Amino acid sequence: MRENWAVVALFTLCIVGFELRFIHGATDASDTSALNTLFSGMHSPAQLTQWTAAAGDPCGQNWRGVTCSGSRVTQIKLSGLELSGTLGGYMLDKLTSLTELDLSSNNLGGDLPYQFPPNLQRLNLANNQFTGAASYSLSQITPLKYLNLGHNQFKGQIAIDFSKLDSLTTLDFSFNSFTNSLPATFSSLTSLKSLYLQNNQFSGTVDVLAGLPLETLNIANNDFTGWIPSSLKGITLIKDGNSFNTGPAPPPPPGTPPIRGSPSRKSGGRESRSSDESTRNGDSKKSGIGAGAIAGIIISLLVVTALLVAFFLFRRKKSKRSSPMDIEKTDNQPFTLASNDFHENNSIQSSSSVETKKLDTSLSINLRPPPIDRNKSFDDEDSTRKPIAVKKSTVVVPSNVRLYSVADLQIATGSFSVDNLLGEGTFGRVYRAEFDDGKVLAVKKIDSSALPHGMTDDFIEMVSKIANLDHPNVTKLVGYCAEHGQHLVVYEFHKNGSLHDFLHLSEEESKALVWNSRVKIALGTARALEYLHEVCSPSIVDKNIKSANILLDSELNPHLSDSGLASFLPTANELLNQTDEGYSAPEVSMSGQYSLKSDIYSFGVVMLELLTGRKPFDSTRSRSEQSLVRWATPQLHDIDALAKMVDPALKGLYPVKSLSRFADVIALCVQPEPEFRPPMSEVVQALVVLVQRANMSKRTVGVDPSQRAGSADTTSDYM
């Protein structure tokens, strides 16, 4: 009987405890109060399910984005939820167990709070609208390892004291308006591996970074001056858009103390004493040089003079026996005195052999010609008197790729007239070229910023590699020109222009892409990327996936243009990083480095364009809708919201299930974390299944430009 009463009592206690848990909550009271205040500061957004402005139980009720350990809140992750308002920060320091706070990619603004959770290890406030200076309160978060304030509206001098933040490994202040020199306390960041300061207005030198264990540094597009410390030259460094000195660094001014721990410090005392002793010895050691020393100098001069005379007599005698052909036979390499025309001998074209001229006997020398740096430019004065050894290129371009002259391309493009200008991209302008035989091609003039004039051999090698790409959805390279310092590539021409023009031009005609055609374009582009990523060996990272580089033929089949160009141009990464059109993956914006996964992200953005008809970044829209990814991503799994974001040009004519599955593929491709993005082969499979199901329940009404020409648009075209 007693045992039964014990069981009843225990059961009663459990019930009472359970009820008390709901009365008092499972969450620490101070944590709950802090989250209530934060919720109010963000205007009580509906997307934060379970959250309340008063009381509640964040841990017990599973508030969205909140992670707990026991009764304490340890993580808050609310990235990309279109949150607005401020941080309501006067209670944040109560979250003493919080180790991660991620509010990135929202519309939060105002100044940063005066106090932050004291034990944060990761703080991400990137891609918001925060203003003012970076709060000094960040100086007190000593456990901090990751801090990202990039893509905000901060300005002025950085007010943070970094002397206590020696655990910090990643720091991102990029794309703000910070000014003045870097804080001296940067030198205390002894664990810092990655630093992103690009696109600000910092000035002064970067000497304070010299002693840090950095592996990645991006300081592009600031006002830095001075010299790059030698310790930074062996890391991943992006520094364009500054005014750094390119010459050797000057020696330290007189009186500058030597670097701590350097050998010169150890010997300095002895040198100083020697100098002092010589001064104290008086005039006896300043009066002159001894007789023995004078005799030694005279004998040395006589020996050197005799050797010089003998050398010149020998050279003169030998030069009389030399014929002009002796010079040409040296090392079996032809060379000549250069005129104003520079002839280059490439094995890819038999007609481009080097002219060999006989040298005048009076100018003949029998010295082995020095190797010529192909990157070196010769001015007119040098080129009229110095022999130039021309390097032979051993790269062979496929025979079906034609070598054009500049004159040929000038005639075909009307001297590269504006009337024939098709577009302008990151690496140069593209012109329509019509040849005498009626053939129409597209000619791209590669800017010298992308490929300097002296790098013709590199250009030939690049052409050879791109010419070997062979896929029906990759624009074919059919010719090239390397003449007079110009580098041009010639592609097949597609009269319907680019996908960008179809989607974003105001003319009604450009809005006629029906749903099936959009899926067809997505699938064809995916197959092109699958070829580059998984068929080519080694894999090719395109780096420049965007709607402007997807050309459409008369049947609206997509052709990926400029494929491989960015992978082989030496300055491609730097040029691409200077312009962010909304296609760049988050990791590219942070590090400037491209990968197969960043290509997949960019492809996801193109799919969003096909879905919504919007540009990846549109400054004419409201702030919350300027970034297509940030605006669209939270709505991709909500069928009602999805229907509202579809391109109005479709006029509601699309299969709802097809639309939903299309959105699912997009969501996978634009995952913030690259490891969660699928390989292109899986993307292709998903789109193929989408097409197959569309064939069974086809619901497409509309007229494509191809249909106006008399050809029917059928889903079988993109099977």
From Swiss-Prot:
One of its GO terms (cellular component) is membrane. Residues 315-719 are cytoplasmic. The modification Phosphoserine is found at S377. It is found in: Membrane. Residues 30-293 are extracellular. Cannot functionally replace STRUBBELIG. Over-expression of SRF6 induces no obvious phenotypes. The protein kinase domain is predicted to be catalytically inactive. Belongs to the protein kinase superfamily. Ser/Thr protein kinase family. This is Protein STRUBBELIG-RECEPTOR FAMILY 6. It comes from Arabidopsis thaliana (Mouse-ear cress).
